[in-house]
């Protein structure tokens, strides 16, 4: 069982020079605006640290969090960071600001060697959107041998049972499923504990 020993906010940044030092392995959370990134991070860390905006795409900062997890089963304690990226597909942003914003994010993902895992949140109700395909392709062009990419489907509990089963069978692997409270809808769907164990495994495979 994984116990969350600590989780806290570090800082927000809109420029590479403002980002905190890379002292631990890092996990990046990315996805379209309004896909549920804040809810996912807060549930994952067991604290309401990530703030969501009522206006999709309003948040223009990369937010950094630190957390310490204790894996009781393996007698292992690990500290790592979570980077919450601004949602993409945003609206009402000037072209110059959009270009500057995208440049910062691309530079951040390209040069920050402490990033070990990319978590791409995808709305289970809207699969195969071009914007998600492009995001996946862009991230995969950046991947080094010590990094991993993982899809995680949000709003899974809003699908009917047939849609859930179809997604579970046909979605590209590897992937995880995030329900509203991470309660398993049946024994074959991952619980919060399984999600945490899976993410920790990826982070520990290529430690900083």
Curated annotation (Swiss-Prot):
Binding site for Mg(2+): 38, 59
Gene3D superfamilies: P-loop containing nucleotide triphosphate hydrolases (3.40.50.300)
Stated name of the protein: Probable GTP-binding protein EngB
InterPro entries according to UniProt: G_ENGB_dom, GTP-bd, GTP-bd_ribosome_bio_YsxC, P-loop_NTPase
Gene from which this protein is expressed: engB
Sequence ranges assigned to domain EngB-type G in this UniProt record: 23-205
PROSITE patterns: G_ENGB
Molecular function GO labels: GTP binding; metal ion binding
Annotated function: Necessary for normal cell division and for the maintenance of normal septation.
Names of the cofactor(s): Mg(2+)
Protein family (similarity comment): Belongs to the TRAFAC class TrmE-Era-EngA-EngB-Septin-like GTPase superfamily. EngB GTPase family.
Record keywords: Cell cycle, Cell division, GTP-binding, Magnesium, Metal-binding, Nucleotide-binding, Septation
Binding site for GTP: 31-38, 57-61, 84-87, 154-157, 182-184
Lineage top rank: taxon: Bacteria
One Gene Ontology CC term in the entry: cytosol
Any single biological process term in GO: division septum assembly
Organism from which the protein derives: Helicobacter acinonychis (strain Sheeba)
HAMAP family named in the record: GTPase_EngB
């Amino acid at each position: 069982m994984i116990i969350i020993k600590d989780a806290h906010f570090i800082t927000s940044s809109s420029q590479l020079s403002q980002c905190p030092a890379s002292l631990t392995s890092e996990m990046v959370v990315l996805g379209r605006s309004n896909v549920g990134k804040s809810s996912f991070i807060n549930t994952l860390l067991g604290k309401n640290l990530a703030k969501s905006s009522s206006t999709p795409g309003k948040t223009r900062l990369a937010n950094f969090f630190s957390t310490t997890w204790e894996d009781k089963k393996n007698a292992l304690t690990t500290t790592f960071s979570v980077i919450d990226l601004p949602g993409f597909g945003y609206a009402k942003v000037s072209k110059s600001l959009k270009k500057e914003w995208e440049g910062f994010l691309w530079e951040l993902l390209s040069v920050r060697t402490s990033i070990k895992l990319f978590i791409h949140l995808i709305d289970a109700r809207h699969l195969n959107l071009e914007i998600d395909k492009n995001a996946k392709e862009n991230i995969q062009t950046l991947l080094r041998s010590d990094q991993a990419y993982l899809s995680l489907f949000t709003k899974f509990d809003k699908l009917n049972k047939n849609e859930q089963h179809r997604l579970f069978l046909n979605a590209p692997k590897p992937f995880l499923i995030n329900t509203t409270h991470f309660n398993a809808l049946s024994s074959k769907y991952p619980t919060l504990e399984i999600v945490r164990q899976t993410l920790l495994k990826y982070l520990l495979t290529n430690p900083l």
